[in-house]
Amino acid sequence: MAEQVLVGDVGGTNARLALCSLQDGSLSHIKNYSGAEYPSLEAVIRVYLEETAAKVSSACIAIACPITGDWVAMTNHTWAFSQSEMQQNLGLQHLSIINDFTAISMAIPALKDEDKIQFGGEAAQAGKPIAVYGAGTGLGVAHLVHSGEAWMSLPGEGGHVDFAPNSTEEVMVLEALREELGHVSAERLLSGPGLVNIYRGLVLSDDRVPENLQPKDVTERALADEDIDCRRALSLFCVLMGRFGGNLALNLGTFGGVYIAGGIVPRFLEFFKASGFRVAFEDKGRFHSYLEPIPVFLITHEQPGLLGSGAYLRQKLGYKL
């Protein structure tokens, strides 16, 4: 039996853990745990190892927060821990704690054709830079570059760059939201809560009072064609996803492709396909022709965070991806 390592994908609500084969990166024994039911990440890992009777010497856990040193404090959870202490407590020879979008970016080289849907552009160019972003609870961003024999993820907090409007409607939304929020980042519009902000901004810019809606309300009403404001909001969301993706492509010349990680887009996939997303992606004036061949993909793999955590660790331990 091939040696296995522990991999994880931890968000503000759930912790997903699995075993990953060092030989081929395949995943097994995938389990999901509610973070609210455990006092710490270490406690969840101990339960998982006991339930699976797994013996591992190495682990890689992806977490939805910035990783800047030994101490890790989750953004949307009370869990906080020292990486070195947890490694020692669990008796691991190696422990890597990485950002969730570092993991998702590292999953991309392992994706098969059936794990993604293409939106325009030509074939991805092998070995060229890649960008990945995803709108969920927040807006995650990472880049991936090939260096020598290895893939290198370039994580950051790109979701918090300034929102840059590019139409009269977008300027009006920005002005309405600025009065409520102060600084308006891209994440304030490109996320689940951001979809509601777009709806609010559109209604407020018309000098009307918005309803108190949740993201799913906006999506459901838009798809049912029951509410013109919600439909406008969802349409603008798709356009802004395109503009933001085009900006990422320009930043690093991502002829290896721009990837959208799951998040909320799959909930309205057909609407997204028919939206102004791709036109907005290429809408860069003189650089339209530069962006035209760059493909955009939606990741449909169910566990890209786990897959990427495994890929990150396998490469770190000397395995070629």
Swiss-Prot record:
> Binding of ATP: at which residues?
8-13
Which family does the record claim for this protein?
Belongs to the bacterial glucokinase family.
Q: Which GO molecular function entries does the Swiss-Prot or TrEMBL record give?
A: ATP binding; D-glucose binding; glucokinase activity
Does the keyword field hold Cell membrane?
Answer: no
Give the Enzyme Commission number: 2.7.1.2
Q: Which InterPro entries match?
A: ATPase_NBD, Bacterial_glucokinase, Glucokinase
| Keyword terms of this UniProt record | ATP-binding, Cytoplasm, Glycolysis, Kinase, Nucleotide-binding, Transferase
Keyword Cytoplasm belongs to the record: yes
Q: A biological process (GO) annotation for this entry?
A: glycolytic process
Q: Which organism is it from?
A: Tolumonas auensis (strain DSM 9187 / NBRC 110442 / TA 4)
Could you tell me the superkingdom of the organism this chain comes from?
Bacteria
**What is the name listed in the Swiss-Prot or TrEMBL entry for this protein?**
Glucokinase
Q: What's one GO-annotated cellular component?
A: cytosol
Question: Which NCBIfam families does the record cross-reference, listed alphabetically?
Answer: glk, PRK00292.1-1, PRK00292.1-3, PRK12408.1
Q: Cross-referenced Pfam families, in alphabetical order?
A: Glucokinase (PF02685)
Which reaction(s) are listed as its catalytic activity? D-glucose + ATP = D-glucose 6-phosphate + ADP + H(+)
Localization (cell) = Cytoplasm
Q: Where are the transmembrane segments?
A: none
